[in-house]
């Protein structure tokens, strides 16, 4: 943020210039929100003709930084900017009573909220033959650890290094389960349904209270992180060279209660011109219209069919971008 002058009795023009810069920044931040997601995972599989078992650990994070800009803050700063009399009066008041006489009249807030979820579980899967149709069923019971952060403060005091302080953090541990089923029809078609986090969980953030400098009213800032079942259905057509996929969420994607929900559909294609090389492209859209639609692309390498390296990137509207990598080894 633009700094307020430490010596309010200095140049009135400088004081008004600082007020203008700060008002301009508040105008720019009004309604702005930034979101980010990240994930990582590790799995060790033990294939078996009767029952396949895999030990898994994965984590994913969801974060959002947003501002709540009070229009009265902007109006107050514009009055300082445009009137020498107002600027001189505010500067004199600050000189006599301290510079907090200025900032106490500014009540815009900034909020950084984040959730980090880690899963530790054992996945078991088995294939059956139902009327000549190969059907695979898998279940993953898992321990789920969640950390939820709610760093909300005056926008003029916001410090991104403080968001993970323990006084803004809530910890929670629970149990959850994933499950899925897939069937192969003929040589080229596979259809399936998967369910993640089949047990709903709610984790409340810390209740952060901020006093309004103008009215004296104490405002409570609290949220709830929602873990909800996510059920997705998909189909794939494949041969030795090409795989085409389509999938869609049958349930909404939840996050913080204060956020809009999303529900995604996507299509993708993979071409394997060489036994050790795969090239991928796809598109994902939010049918709710609350998240950016994105294009994805990637490449996979499998030298000697032992080491598998997958790289991907995505790009979409509203300055949405991302990247990912996966490494696996077969022994």
Task: Cite the ranges covered by each PLM segment.
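A subset of solvent-exposed loop/turn segments in beta-rich extracellular surface proteins, enriched
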Residues: 1-165
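N-terminal start-of-chain detector that recognizes signal peptides
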Residues: 15-16, 25-28, 110, 163-165, ...
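Short sequence motifs at beta-strands and strand-loop junctions characteristic
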Residues: 24-37, 110-117, 167-174, 223-229, ...
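Loop-centered beta-sheet repeat module
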Residues: 139-206
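Outer membrane beta-barrel transmembrane domains
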Residues: 188-331
């Amino acid at each position: 943020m633009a700094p307020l002058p430490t010596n309010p009795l200095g140049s009135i023009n400088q004081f008004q210039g600082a007020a203008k810069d700060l008002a301009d920044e508040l105008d720019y931040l009004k309604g702005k929100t930034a979101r980010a997601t990240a994930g990582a995972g590790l799995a060790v599989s033990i294939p078996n003709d009767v029952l396949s078992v895999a030990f898994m650990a994965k984590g994913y994070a969801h974060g959002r930084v947003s501002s709540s800009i009070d229009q009265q803050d902007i109006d107050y700063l514009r009055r300082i900017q445009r009137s020498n009399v107002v600027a001189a009066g505010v500067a004199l008041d600050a000189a006599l009573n301290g510079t907090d006489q200025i900032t106490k009249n500014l009540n815009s807030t900034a909020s950084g909220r984040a959730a980090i979820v880690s899963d530790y579980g054992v996945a078991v899967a088995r294939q059956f033959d139902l009327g000549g149709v190969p059907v695979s069923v898998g279940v993953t019971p898992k321990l789920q650890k969640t950390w939820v952060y709610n760093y909300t403060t005056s926008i003029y005091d916001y410090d991104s290094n403080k968001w993970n302080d323990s006084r803004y953090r809530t910890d929670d541990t629970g149990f959850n389960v994933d499950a899925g089923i897939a069937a192969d029809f003929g040589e080229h078609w596979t259809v399936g349904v998967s369910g993640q986090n089949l047990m709903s969980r709610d984790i409340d953030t810390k209740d952060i209270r901020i006093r309004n400098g103008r009215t004296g009213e104490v405002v409570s800032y609290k949220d709830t992180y929602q873990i909800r079942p996510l059920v997705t259905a998909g189909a794939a057509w494949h041969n030795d060279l090409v795989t085409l996929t389509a999938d869609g969420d049958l349930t909404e994607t939840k996050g913080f209660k204060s956020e809009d929900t999303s529900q995604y559909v996507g299509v993708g294609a993979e071409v394997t011109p060489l036994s050790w090389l795969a090239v991928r492209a796809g598109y994902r859209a939010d049918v709710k219209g609350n998240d950016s639609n994105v294009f994805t692309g990637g490449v996979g390498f499998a030298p000697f069919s032992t080491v598998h390296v997958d790289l991907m990137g995505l790009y979409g509207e509203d300055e949405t971008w991302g990247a990912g990598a996966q490494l696996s080894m077969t022994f």
